[in-house]
Curated annotation (Swiss-Prot):
Residues 474-486, 523-536 have a biased composition (Polar residues). Residues 205-261 form the GYF domain. The gene is SMY2. This is Protein SMY2. The modification Phosphothreonine is found at T129, T311. Belongs to the SMY2/mpd2 family. InterPro entries: GRB10-interact_GYF, GYF, GYF-like_dom_sf. Present with 486 molecules/cell in log phase SD medium. The lineage of its organism: Eukaryota, Fungi, Dikarya, Ascomycota, Saccharomycotina. It is found in: Cytoplasm. GO terms for cellular component: cytoplasm; cytosol; endoplasmic reticulum membrane; nucleus. Gene3D superfamilies: 3.30.1490.40. Pfam families: GYF. It comes from Saccharomyces cerevisiae (strain ATCC 204508 / S288c).
Length: 740
């Protein structure tokens, strides 16, 4: 069926198109202010019609006409059919703003214009307008009218246009303006209401690691590889896996090794691939976050409402079917105002977003304040605990310091009390000793005054010159000290220090007495009247032997026997006087000869060693010469001292007794060898100190092992005398012929 008025339709379309071209040129020359049109650049927005549209294209070749027939029609008018309701059943009238727009399928052939026509810049079709245009909702590509129009093509060789002259429905104003704007002016990121399109979900592929049965870590591997191995049955539910924390995830398994069964439990998926399922959950989380981020810039409702109102004012007035196609009698057109969204709805949405944003901000602020308050409370509690610990520590230290001070004071107090007690005891002891000493001296003096005649009953015949001899004062002092020391030994003992000092003093006095006796010995028949001496010195009467010793009959008998021995030994002095010329005061010394030391026998027996030395001093002073002459035995210590003096060749001005006294004070062990050696080298230039020290220690040890010597070292040294003057040194020259 041929549609009526087809020639008129083409003629009217040509005229209308020329008018539109002129209008567009005039508009470009006016340069009116307006907002540039922002449309979607996809070619699908150019050719889709809601109720069916005429697919028409303008041939840019000169000389083309709309009234020429195509070669395919053979000079006939193109067939057309009336629209039917079936064509529009199941067709989506408007495309979803959330679905991606696709370009229409246009068959490419040598007889059909290329797709560059759809995207080309046609000056005659560009219309500059200050009015901002809204993008149209896209139509589903399954429309029958779109398919029918798309199947029509333009034969470029004949410059003819195939047009569906029977539209399915009356075109709208928006459909009439689709081909007037090229797709190059439409930005690709615009969507309706001036808001940017939502980004497509970004697919994230995770990286995984796993630990094998030997404990070695392998990876990282992608989700695809892990899924293939899982599907192949290589992974057990006990396999330990870990996801690399390159991107955030919702399950909290980044960089943590968990078993595959635990991952499936967290995902609550037991019959699917856990790796792919995890990535899907992760992508959904990322997409929801991107939606929230895209809505955030439009939280202000004032700006969005102003933009929508400006768009409503600047939109083109819709063009009707009559003023485009200039058709007589037919269908009437209705003006359609395109409003993509209601301002009220948008403002309400913006307000809701604003309220949500405010509520979120308040919630975050409340959480922040609460966390700060909790942190502050924790800090205060920690500081309080630290202060309490510090206070306890200081209290403990102060208590410990106080206890130390108390202990120190207590100790000092005890020491002070102990010293005071010791001082009181010492003072009491001194007082008691003094009183006892006074009483003893009084009683001893009284008893000795009665017993003195008995001591002088058996005196020897005095010499003619006995009355002229004056006794040295040292004899009297030695007798007094001997008597007093005897009384003290029988009484309470003195301190160790006092006893030692008195013994040393007594030995020195005895030494002086013995030396005097050796060098100035009296004749054999000379005696000393002890009675007259005691009468001259009344003090000696008080200091006599103790009462018990004088009353003892055995003591008196022993003294008598000793006195008889002294008298009997005086007869032998005549025979030995020639041998002891150096000790007699009547001989003349003609040369420095070595003086022989007379044999000295102790007047004490072994049973009488406990007696006081003062009594011996008495007997020895009464007859000193006869006593020494009567001694037949020689003490081992005297022999040792004699050997020492024979070996010692000291420097001038140094006496043998002083050096021997020092050497005898040292111990007998080998530790004294070096000291003896150094002493000899210091006091002699010719002696071999090393050899002398060795022989000295050897002989001394042998002497002390005998144990039957009644004399001590000091007594033996005192009896040996000081015969340093008898030494005579002679320098011996080296003999000729001797090498050594």
């Amino acid at each position: 069926m041929i549609a009526p008025d087809s020639q008129r339709l083409f003629g009217s379309f040509d005229e209308q198109f020329k008018d539109l071209k002129l209008d567009s040129v005039d508009t470009e020359n006016n340069n009116t202010h307006g907002v540039s049109t922002i449309l979607d650049s996809s070619p699908a927005s150019v050719n889709n019609n809601t109720n069916g549209a005429v697919a028409a294209s303008v041939n840019t070749v000169p000389g083309s006409t709309f009234r020429s027939n195509t070669p395919l029609l053979g000079g006939r008018h193109p067939l057309s059919r009336t629209s039917s309701l079936i064509d529009s059943i199941g067709i989506q009238r408007a495309a979803s703003p959330f679905s991606s727009m696709k370009e229409p399928f246009i068959p490419q052939s040598s007889g059909v214009m290329s797709s560059s026509f759809w995207h080309g810049d046609h000056p005659e079709s560009r219309v500059s307008t200050p009015v901002q245009q809204h993008p149209l909702l896209q139509r589903n590509e399954s429309s029958s009218s779109f398919s029918y129009a798309a199947n029509l093509g333009v034969n470029l060789s004949t410059h003819s246009l195939a047009v569906d002259i029977t539209p399915l429905s009356t075109p709208t104003a928006a459909q009439s303006h689709v081909n007037l704007f090229p797709s190059s002016d439409i930005p690709p990121n615009m969507s309706m209401n001036g808001m940017s399109q939502l980004p497509a979900p970004v697919s994230v592929e995770s990286s995984w690691r796993y630990i094998d049965t030997q404990g070695q870590i392998h990876g990282p591997f992608t989700t695809q590889m892990m899924s293939q191995w899982y599907i192949g049955g290589y992974f057990a539910s006990t396999l330990q896996i870990s996801r690399l924390g390159s991107t955030p995830e919702t399950l909290g398994i980044n960089d943590i090794f968990i078993t595959l069964g635990e991952l499936m439990t967290k995902l609550e998926k037991y019959d699917t691939d856990p790796f792919t399922t995890f990535d899907k959950l992760h992508v959904q989380t990322t997409s929801s976050d991107s939606i929230n981020l895209n809505l955030a810039p439009y939280a202000s409702g004032v700006a969005a409402t102003g933009t929508i109102k400006a768009t409503e004012n600047d939109i083109f007035k819709p063009l009707t079917h009559d003023n485009i196609w200039d058709m007589d009698g037919g269908t009437t057109s209705k003006g359609v105002d395109i409003k993509l969204a209601s301002a009220t709805t948008i403002s309400q949405t913006d307000e809701s977003h604003k309220q949500e944003y405010k509520s979120t901000t308040m919630l975050e602020k409340g959480k922040k304040e609460k966390s700060e308050s909790v942190a502050k409370a924790l800090l205060d509690e920690q500081e309080k605990r630290n202060r309490e610990l510090k206070r306890k520590e200081e209290a403990r230290l102060s208590k410990k310091q106080k206890q130390k001070e108390d202990d120190l004071l207590k100790k000092q107090k005890e020491q002070k009390e102990q010293k005071e007690k010791e001082a009181l005891e010492a003072e009491k002891q001194k007082k008691s000793e003094k009183t006892k000493k006074d009483t003893q001296t009084q009683t001893e003096g009284f008893k000795t005054s009665k017993d003195l005649p008995s001591l002088n009953s058996s005196s020897a015949n005095p010499a003619p010159w006995a009355s002229k001899v004056k006794v040295n004062n040292a004899i009297e002092t030695s007798i007094k000290n001997g008597v007093s020391s005897t009384g003290k030994k029988k009484g309470e003992p003195l301190g160790l220090q006092q006893r030692n000092s008195k013994e040393e003093k007594q030995k020195e006095e005895l030494k002086s007495v013995l030396n005097w006796a050796n060098k100035s010995s009296l004749p054999s028949n000379q005696t000393i009247d002890i009675k007259s001496q005691f009468q001259k010195s009344p003090k000696g009467m008080k200091e006599s032997s103790p009462l018990k010793e004088l009353e003892d009959p055995n003591f008196i008998e022993e003294q008598k026997k000793l006195w008889e021995k002294v008298q009997s030994s005086s007869k032998q002095v005549k025979s030995t006087s020639s041998a002891s010329t150096t000790t007699s005061s009547w001989t003349t010394v003609t040369s420095k000869g070595k003086a022989p030391i007379g044999t000295v026998v102790s007047p004490y027996s072994k049973t009488n060693t406990s007696l006081n030395s003062s009594l011996t001093a008495k007997t020895s002073t009464t007859s000193t010469t006869t006593t020494f002459a009567s001694m037949n035995n020689v003490s081992p210590r005297q022999e040792f001292i004699k050997w020492c003096k024979s070996q010692m060749k000291l420097n001038s001005g140094i006496t043998n007794n002083n050096v021997l006294e020092l050497l005898l004070s040292l111990p007998t062990g080998p530790e004294s060898k070096e000291l003896i050696q150094e002493t000899i080298y210091a006091n002699s230039d010719v002696m071999d100190g090393r050899r002398f020290a060795t022989e000295f220690i050897k002989r001394r040890v042998a002497c002390e092992k005998q144990g039957d010597d009644p004399l001590s070292w000091n007594e033996a040294l005192a009896l040996s005398g000081n015969d340093d003057d008898g030494w005579e040194f002679q320098v011996v020259s080296k003999k000729k012929g001797r090498k050594h």
